[in-house]
Amino acid sequence: MRVGLLFGGRSGEHEVSISSARAIASALSAGENASKYEILPFYIHKDGRWLAGEAPQQVLKSGAPLLESSNSSPAENNLVNSQQQTLERWQSPSQVAEVDVWFPILHGPNGEDGTIQGLLTLMQTPFVGSGVLGSALGMDKIAMKMAFEQAGLPQVKYKAVTRAQIWSNPCVFPKLCDEIEASLGYPCFVKPANLGSSVGISKVRSRQELEDALDNAANYDRRIIIEAGVAAREVECAVLGNDQPQASTVGEITFNSDFYDYETKYTAGKADLLIPAIIPDDISRQIQNMALQAFAAVDAAGLARVDFFYVEATGEVLINEINTLPGFTATSMYPQLWAHSGIPFPELVDKLVQLAIERHNPSH
């Protein structure tokens, strides 16, 4: 079976995508998987070009992005460029036609937000992970919160604002900040609604910091969410499956930085993953059940990692967010949670491919 491994992308998480793709390629080539799967890598350059052939192999081998000036692949392998993004260009390369199932491991905007999932749906080929709806809801923090609210899942207080409210009228901005202070207080977190891996997020403790953070977040997205801060432990649960998903052992993240930011997430030694989390059994079961509820609430499929706040003082569990395309790097929580739950990395990747095929070809 030929697996189209799609990685890179134009988002700020390009390097994370490469790291994830390398780990997945290694898992698809390990043990029994080696005789089941043939990997066809496709690399999306930072400039938007889609490359097949030698270029993706080079990136997987080196672990480094191709330079902007690189012209290492022949013209016929330049599948799509930013000037001529047409389905005709997609239909011609033989490599695309040969793919039996796609494994998109593109993090961030244009990767896990439903856009690439829409293209793969149009191609009528199975692909790993959630479809357009689940991906879009899992990416947009505001829409996600609304879905959780509808499902009755407890979460921190939040307020949604737009770039226009922040930038368009200097008379309105102070009033907006007044409302945020009154409803959420300090500390609070300001986040772009549609960026992953904690990009553009600020923790604020004062009016000046709030104003600066809102202005900064507006540079990243036209929709911004502000969440009340909470003194809590950060715990995570992985979900695997389609219509009858399973929840993993619960893990905990501990870190010394102010919050779990981009650098902390992807720098070895900056954060510790404790699996299983040392929490009461009933709390662990509650988190697993809530993870499955969240998975259903956004119509996720295949895989997701669900993040929670555990307020130890009160025993309260609050849902933070769902990530429908979690990282697969060496430091990533998702594969580690399943490894501790009895599913090693190569078996996990195999299951995800099989789930993609099952979802594409439902049976009674």
UniProtKB/Swiss-Prot annotation:
Residues at which ATP binds: 181-236
Cofactor: Mg(2+); Mn(2+)
Short name of any one Pfam family annotated for the protein: Dala_Dala_lig_C
GO cellular component entries: cytosol
InterPro entries: ATP-grasp, ATP_grasp_subdomain_1, D-Ala_lig_Van_CS, D_ala_D_ala, Dala_Dala_lig_C, Dala_Dala_lig_N, PreATP-grasp_dom_sf
One term of GO molecular function: metal ion binding
Keywords for this protein: ATP-binding, Cell shape, Cell wall biogenesis/degradation, Cytoplasm, Ligase, Magnesium, Manganese, Metal-binding, Nucleotide-binding, Peptidoglycan synthesis
GO biological process: cell wall organization; peptidoglycan biosynthetic process; regulation of cell shape
Domain ATP-grasp: 145-354
Top-tier EC class: ligase
Tagged with keyword Transcription: no
Entry keyword annotation includes Nucleotide-binding: yes
Cofactor binding comment, as recorded: Binds 2 magnesium or manganese ions per subunit.
Pathway: Cell wall biogenesis; peptidoglycan biosynthesis
UniProt-annotated binding residues for Mg(2+) 2: 321, 323
Stored PROSITE patterns: ATP_GRASP, DALA_DALA_LIGASE_1, DALA_DALA_LIGASE_2
Recorded family membership: Belongs to the D-alanine--D-alanine ligase family.
Function: Cell wall formation.
Protein name: D-alanine--D-alanine ligase
